[in-house]
Curated annotation (Swiss-Prot):
Involved in the synthesis of glucuronoxylan hemicellulose in secondary cell walls. It is found in: Golgi apparatus membrane. GO terms for cellular component: Golgi membrane. PANTHER family: GALACTOSYLGALACTOSYLXYLOSYLPROTEIN 3-BETA-GLUCURONOSYLTRANSFERASE BETA-1,3-GLUCURONYLTRANSFERASE (PTHR10896), GLUCURONOSYLTRANSFERASE OS04G0650300-RELATED (PTHR10896:SF24). One of its GO terms (biological process) is glucuronoxylan biosynthetic process. Signal peptide: none annotated. This is Probable glucuronosyltransferase Os04g0650300.
Length: 446
């Protein structure tokens, strides 16, 4: 085919070739352009066909041996076949043989409808492993639902492990001091739904003044949480909170303590950051303030240097107090929702799991200092900044005492009910609209 290379040999191969001393003949004309185009077309065709067959040979040599080689070869070469038989049935028989038993399973597929369906020849491979294609993932819907629950549980565990690390989560102890007010039942109900989203074991400690109330007990019973309902000697929120911390020390409860006050809104990321605390830690918290008729909104957060060490606290929009000024920090109004504590740091009795020297004794904290979360430490600079010392709020606290004086229905229930019982006469005037009008007038006064 390489005719130009043979051109120098033509005079020697020709029968009429003369002696070497004879004069050279005039050069012959070049090959026509049509012949060159035909030659290029044949070369391209041979390359395409060769690549196709070489690819098929590679598949046959290096892929694992399928169950049905003939069907596997057909599936590689040709697309799936459309079967449109009106009354066709398919029977699939699978035989599994082991050293002791032989199990034969026969599955009869449903009749193919009038509409065509796709059928694959041979098994479908995912990587190097064949899988079985079913028209439905599992014939039993109950088993399918269980499989979805298992997948959801595995995915939640993987997301939680990526957030907090590979180790199991420590127990969470949520402390909530509560007093009777219009916000008590709504706030506790909202907090219960938030705590139910926490990964890992959780104990909810709710402290009431003097005695238990039915409204709080009803919220706790509906929460489906592990709770501890106790009472304190005083109605002050700070004293009730300290009473809960003494109860943790008395019972030697292990875990991380999160302060979930009634006026707080917590994010689930707060509980993930609380897992990192060693003794006492601080997180950013947004504050919505209403003090003496003025409204102020700012972010309370720890302030860090370039190395990530605590240097102060942001206590307002434009004020940052240094960490070494404990007197100024104690006098400032810091929110308990922005601090987390390791429960073992409250224990007494010595040992590795005992209170550090820079953590205050709960019994030695007076009532005036109990309102500040920094009363738990003797050195405010030893507090651990969490959340990478970021400026994104992990909780919000609403400072407002106006709703504590608002009148509200007992347990937020309408008594008598709106539905009239059958024993009453139809022409009798219901008393419920009158009570509803009274409630509206009461709300209008405030």
């Amino acid at each position: 085919m390489k005719l130009p290379l043979l051109r120098p040999l033509w005079p020697m191969l020709s029968p009429a070739a003369g002696s070497p001393d004879s004069p050279p003949e005039p050069s012959k004309p070049s090959l026509p352009a049509a012949w060159l185009l035909l030659h290029a077309l044949f070369c391209a065709t041979s390359m395409a066909v060769g690549f196709r067959f070489s690819r098929l040979i590679v598949y046959l040599l290096f892929l694992p041996t399928p169950i049905n080689p003939t069907a596997h070869l057909v599936s590689l070469v040709s697309p799936p076949v459309m079967l449109a038989a009106a009354n066709a049935t398919t029977t699939i028989t699978t035989t599994t043989t082991t050293t002791t038993t032989t199990v034969t399973t026969t599955t009869v597929a449903a009749e193919v409808g009038a509409h065509p369906q796709h059928h694959h020849h041979g098994p479908v491979f995912v990587g190097r492993h064949p899988i079985r294609v079913r028209p439905w993932p599992h014939p039993d819907p109950n088993e399918l639902l269980k499989a979805h629950h298992i997948l959801a549980a595995v995915q939640n565990a993987q997301r939680s492990s990526r957030r907090r690390g590979a180790g199991p989560p420590r127990p969470v102890i949520a402390v909530t001091p509560t007093t009777t007010s219009a916000l008590q039942v709504p706030s506790l109900t909202s907090m219960a739904h938030t705590l139910r989203l926490v990964d890992g074991p959780l104990t909810w400690i709710v402290v009431e003044p003097e005695h238990h109330t039915d409204a709080v007990a009803a919220v706790l019973s509906r929460s489906n949480l592990n709770f501890l309902h106790i009472t304190g000697p005083d109605s002050s929120t700070s004293r009730l909170r300290m009473h809960a911390l003494r109860e943790i020390r008395k019972r030697k409860m292990d875990g991380v303590v999160v302060f979930a006050d009634e006026n707080s809104i917590l994010r689930t990321e707060l509980f993930d950051e609380a897992q990192k605390v060693k003794s006492v830690g601080a997180v950013p918290v947004g504050v919505l303030g209403e003090d003496e008729g003025t409204s102020e909104t700012f972010l309370q957060a720890p302030s860090c240097d370039a190395e990530g060490k605590l240097v102060g606290y942001h206590v307002s929009e434009e004020t940052m107090l240094p960490a070494n000024r404990g007197d100024m920090l104690l006098s400032s109004r810091l929110e308990w929702a922005g601090f987390v504590v390791n429960a073992q740091a409250l224990w007494e009795g010595g040992g590795a799991a005992s209170r550090p020297e820079w953590v205050s004794d709960i019994d030695a904290i007076d009532d005036g200092a109990a309102a500040s979360p920094l009363s738990l430490v003797t050195d405010a600079a030893r507090v651990e900044p969490l959340a990478s010392c970021g400026q994104a709020a992990l909780a919000w606290s609403h400072r407002s005492d106006a709703l504590h004086e608002v009148k509200f229905p007992h347990e937020w229930k309408i008594d008598p009910p709106l539905v009239t019982i059958a024993s009453r006469q139809q022409d009798a005037k219901p008393e419920t609209p009158l009570k509803r009008t009274t409630l509206l007038n009461t709300e209008g006064q405030h």
